[in-house]
């Protein structure tokens, strides 16, 4: 049996661990042949492939990024995109497809399976940790570790100059990275997309820290919005899935704090550094388990499913169900950590 593998959407630490596990188990236990598709959905759209065998995945476990490349190519925006993918898979002799990605990549896989009957298995990937069907996605733990280390380092420079430091982290619709890293890093204010924030309240918290001779750290998710206003954007261009490229709320907030409190404020936007570099031990562990179970899905003929973490178990859920809604921060959880604000 020949199985195709692709990685779509934004890269994140742990992708190579999935690929390695898929190939190792698929070859050694089931005797499968593997074909890698380059750059997400562009690969099957254009028939751009790379051989995947055990030598090809040797040594990639600790590497960040993806050896297959990735992109935000959207076949649904291409003329006859889904049909072209089906035809190319048939021409290459690919009998099943393992798609590793977030809601957009997996959404295309759902269409491919539903409309053309292409056997697909999904593996969830997003550093935002916002897919509802799984407790955690790989890449999230690494991103939180990177953000926490940055916050730790920024405390010392904030104290040296007695200024406010606003740290902008990733999180379009969900504030998991902001909440976890902010709490772990001892931030004095944490702002998330799920809860619109009051700028005056933020300034009050900041001022209270200065009264205690302490330089405050404000952690804000890129998708956070002020109570009276809209999302702050530097760039209003869209990607191929219609998503705005976020960034700008941190800089805007720092200016508001400086203007309203009279205290000097600076912004650090962590950006893509959260997605890069060596995956954490947990992300390697989780990604490897996802890869092993994805191959089992193929072997069992259990298509249209996505592997997911529930407690310590890897389970199978319908891809359509997994992408139907986002997993966001519960208001009660956000209120729980509010004791540390100000």
UniProtKB/Swiss-Prot annotation:
Cell compartments where the protein resides: Cytoplasm
Pathway(s) this gene product operates in, as recorded in its UniProt entry: Carbohydrate degradation; glycolysis; D-glyceraldehyde 3-phosphate and glycerone phosphate from D-glucose: step 3/4
EC number: 2.7.1.90
Active-site positions on this chain: 128
Family: Belongs to the phosphofructokinase type A (PFKA) family. Mixed-substrate PFK group III subfamily.
Binding partners and assembly: Homodimer or homotetramer.
Protein name: Pyrophosphate--fructose 6-phosphate 1-phosphotransferase
HAMAP family found in the cross-reference section: Phosphofructokinase_III
Site entry (Important for catalytic activity and substrate specificity), positions: 104
Function: Catalyzes the phosphorylation of D-fructose 6-phosphate, the first committing step of glycolysis. Uses inorganic phosphate (PPi) as phosphoryl donor instead of ATP like common ATP-dependent phosphofructokinases (ATP-PFKs), which renders the reaction reversible, and can thus function both in glycolysis and gluconeogenesis. Consistently, PPi-PFK can replace the enzymes of both the forward (ATP-PFK) and reverse (fructose-bisphosphatase (FBPase)) reactions.
Known cofactor(s): Mg(2+)
Species: Streptomyces coelicolor (strain ATCC BAA-471 / A3(2) / M145)
Pfam families from the UniProt entry: PFK
Keyword terms: Cytoplasm, Glycolysis, Kinase, Magnesium, Metal-binding, Transferase
Any one GO CC term of the record: 6-phosphofructokinase complex
Lineage of the organism: Bacteria, Bacillati, Actinomycetota, Actinomycetes, Kitasatosporales
Deleted gene: phenotype: No effect.
Documented activity regulation: Non-allosteric.
InterPro entries for this protein: ATP_PFK (IPR022953), ATP_PFK_prok-type (IPR012003), Phosphofructokinase_CS (IPR015912), Phosphofructokinase_dom (IPR000023), Phosphofructokinase_III (IPR012829), PKF_sf (IPR035966)
Catalytic activity annotation: beta-D-fructose 6-phosphate + diphosphate = beta-D-fructose 1,6-bisphosphate + phosphate + H(+)
Binding annotation for diphosphate: 10
